[in-house]
Amino acid sequence: RIVYAAKGDGVLSAGGACDALGIAPEDFMLNVPAWLGEKPALEAEEDGSCDVLIIGAGNAGTTAALKCAESGLKVILAETQTYDEYDEYACDMAMYNSKLFLDKGTPEIDPMDIFNEYMRLYRGHAHQSIVRDFATRGGEVLDWMVDTYIPAEYTDAYAKTSNYKGNDNFSGICAGQYSFRGMTQWRDVDTNVNMWPFVIRTLHTAFEGLGGEIRWGYQGIELVGGNGEAVTGAVFKDIDGAYKQVNAKVVICCAGDFGGNPDMRLDLSDQMRNLAWSFGKDRTDVASTMGMGRDGSGIRMCLWAGATMEGGPRAGQAAGINGVPGFAFGGAWPCFGGDGKRFMNESLIKHGSNGYLDMLPADSLLVNVTDSNWETYLSYQGYGHETMDRSSDYMVEEVRENMKNYVTGADGFDVRAFARFGKEYSKVYAAETLDELADIVGYTGEAKKNFLAEVAHYNEMCEAGKDSDWGCDPQNLFAIKDAPFFASFSKTSNQVSGGLCQHAAVCTDGSYRVLYGDKTPIEGLYAAGNNCGQRYGIQYATPTAGNSCGSALISGYCAAEHVVESLGK
């Protein structure tokens, strides 16, 4: 039977619902947030015109500009950074089925397997056309850049085709998740310097060689038009503080995310805001959420023109996710908590799997353990951020040498890390017995007894080939039985993980046209990269590391194709 409660403010009524409390807008959510405000009314000096105006010279903006220019269009590329200060965050790019991999013998991957895996991880919240472009066009875009515009000596020196050889015993799927090969990493192997900011400048030079113009130190402020009218340009603020208007037939916004804007981050990143609240922090305080990224100006410009933000939960790049310690050589390993017991399925190592680790109290001990068979165990692992690139022969040899020359004791020893292509090292701890290893990592009393008993129990499950406790993938059940024994360990901070950049942005259609709330396109306005929403759905995920940069490059290229077609070229 249905029970009706007497109605009043917040009192439950039929079916468990309740009356609205009549909260005033200023105490709740605003359709025009304070960080957005009203579109400014600026007096700007006209400063040229073009067929295509592209705002932002990052990954998406650069490929968009280059693709439009080679089609014969007059293109202006505007970038808020000056030429001297220009930088790009990352150098990892997942772009599948490139000749860089295929020519080395890497098997071609079925693009539909890639597409379906990403859509599954996004729980259907991403735009299928945009994700399909990422899955099917990446190799084409990377080959286009490398074959046509990037000097061969730069590709030879810096383009590292991660895991192109594969891994001897890896099945391709771990704990139900695919792991694909396809990340190119642009790094100098000796200095550990990210070389992509240097290499992308060769694309800028090629763009200028095709007649394109780059406006450095041009901060985008507002679009011209929108709200029922065609977008016909944008207003910028130059390095001298003067407002300049550039007119165009089409504008492509590629100005990056809002992760570097504390107010937008607090308001728009519902995941981060509410994660902070779950830690007892003030979710109205911008200091409760941290992160990195751009200033959100491209998104604000689109919103002033009538665009809407994609729905939530809004994906951040690893926002709210903490992982287990890991070894210098990567991989998923048995992990033991502060009480000496396992507490998770370690083979679920991709972004989006470990977020609950944020729920552990401060100073919780986390310990990864393996034994002398560590390299054999590595041959069963996939290709994510957390895994060893066994295609880098010189790095493999150095790791083998480091591990061969292990030093027992509490001081540990250095092992070359596989997180990046360069000279990075991490501590590994060694002991001749598990009892000694327990002392080194800090287990005492009951926790030490639990740890030794848990290892014995874990080894029994490895022998049986089934993890009946946590469901670790059988190919990753690595017994801890042969000395020497190795560990890595750390303690939790109980701090909210801000992750990297934010991937939520404005709603677009499958042609990268920015949409009004009724999902009709805003004439003359396109978006790519982190200005383009619905690329990730609810969370960033890594069947291959580097798909954020890869997606940006691909979306810029594909958006440009649609622009070229719309202009009849």
Regions found by a protein language model. Name each.
Residues 241-320, 543-545, 549-558:
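Glycine-rich loop(s) and the adjacent beta-strand/alpha-helix scaffold that form part
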Residues 222, 433-436, 440-535, 539:
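A glycine-rich dinucleotide-binding beta-alpha-beta segment and adjacent secondary-structure elements
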Residues 47-50, 240-250, 521-522:
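Core beta-strand elements of the Rossmann-like FAD/NAD(P) dinucleotide-binding domain
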Residues 70-90:
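Glycine-rich FAD pyrophosphate-binding loop
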Residues 15-16, 20-22, 27-31, 135-242, ...:
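Conserved redox-cofactor binding core of oxidoreductases
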Residues 299-301, 305-443:
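An anion/pyrophosphate-binding glycine-rich loop and adjacent beta-alpha core
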Residues 2-52, 568:
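Extreme N-terminal leader/targeting segments of oxidoreductases
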